[in-house]
């Protein structure tokens, strides 16, 4: 199972939209159960430290094995990103 890390700002509408689209994609049979989603709030010390360790300074961002998806993307782009991650095995 791949670890997909979500860095977000909980009070931000952009982060909420990004997270909603990501969860919608992860619910598809193609991706269901294939990712372990870890959430880091960038308002916390732990979240900021984790983000810095992988070179991320903005939110919302999804990160997995060196691949980064930044900002609000279409459902298609999110699915394309997840397929790319699964193809890396």
Q: Residues of each region from the PLM?
A:
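Short alpha-helical
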Residues: 13, 46, 76
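Cysteine-centric redox/oxidoreductase cores and disulfide-bonded domains
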Residues: 21-23, 27-28, 56, 75, ...
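Structural micro-motif
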Residues: 52-64
């Amino acid at each position: 199972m791949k670890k997909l890390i979500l860095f977000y700002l909980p009070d931000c509408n952009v982060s909420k939209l990004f997270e909603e689209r990501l969860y919608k994609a992860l619910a598809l049979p193609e991706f269901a159960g294939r990712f372990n989603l870890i959430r880091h709030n960038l308002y916390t010390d732990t979240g900021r430290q984790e983000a810095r360790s992988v070179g991320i300074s903005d939110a919302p961002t999804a990160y997995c094995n060196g691949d980064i998806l930044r900002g609000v993307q279409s459902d298609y782009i999110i699915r394309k990103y997840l397929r790319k991650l699964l193809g890396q095995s």
